[in-house]
């Protein structure tokens, strides 16, 4: 009995020490990586509820979990925020992970516009499906908006080219806001102190996705 108690005590002490070391390692690695990208980063920071609902991607009954929140500014005044996001549908069931990004543009779009992968059953009663004169783009994405003219202002060839590189993303534009959700399916970007971050760097996918979100935001900000 004493032996079992000792083993359990030893197990919990070791586990606590390991988890504490993991947190310190993650915080150091993430803060350093974000600093090089000129982002403000809070490893355990959460994103607010309102932007999630305002994006039009999620319903109010969904349960959200977010962390690894970051923020910054580009183009001399366009503020952005992102976070790792977990979503659970309390009614229909199902969980999915990804990255949620939103930014405030210098100008506003004429009408709300949604760009979503064809594999997603997207519905919005306020928007109609808009035909895009690009067969390759139409194979992957559907666009919902007000009219062809306002959508054409957004979907320039440069914008489409960048968007085509990453298929599993949802984009919505409302007023002067852009919202992007990347359905990466990755539930854990944190580096493991027991593994070499040179050979296995879990931050790189997150960094790559955020940089593409910023690039898309820059293109859109200049188009409006």
Name these PLM-found stretches:
Residues 31-224:
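Charged, low-complexity intrinsically disordered regions
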Residues 1-2, 54:
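Accessible peptide chain termini
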Residues 2-27:
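Transmembrane alpha-helices and immediately adjacent membrane-cytoplasm interface residues
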């Amino acid at each position: 009995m004493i032996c079992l108690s000792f083993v359990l005590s030893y197990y919990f002490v070791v586990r606590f020490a390991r988890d504490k070391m993991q947190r310190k390692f993650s915080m150091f690695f993430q803060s350093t990586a974000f600093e090089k990208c000129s982002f403000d980063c809070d490893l355990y920071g959460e994103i607010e509820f309102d932007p999630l609902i305002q994006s039009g991607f999620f319903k109010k009954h969904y349960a959200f979990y977010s962390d690894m929140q970051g923020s910054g500014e580009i183009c001399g005044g366009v503020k952005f925020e992102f976070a790792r996001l977990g979503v659970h549908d309390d009614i229909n069931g199902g969980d999915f992970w990804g990255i949620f990004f939103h930014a405030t543009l210098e100008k506003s779009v004429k009408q709300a516009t949604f760009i979503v992968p064809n594999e997603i059953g997207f519905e919005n009663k306020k928007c109609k499906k808009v035909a895009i004169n690009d067969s390759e783009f139409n194979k992957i994405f559907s666009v919902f908006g007000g009219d062809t003219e306002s959508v054409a202002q957004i979907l320039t060839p440069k914008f489409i080219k960048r968007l085509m590189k990453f298929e599993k993303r949802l984009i919505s534009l409302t007023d002067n806001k852009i919202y992007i959700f990347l359905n990466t399916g990755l539930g854990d970007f944190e580096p493991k102190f027991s593994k070499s971050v040179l050979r296995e760097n879990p931050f790189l996918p997150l960094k790559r996705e955020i940089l593409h979100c910023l690039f898309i935001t820059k293109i859109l900000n200049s188009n409006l």
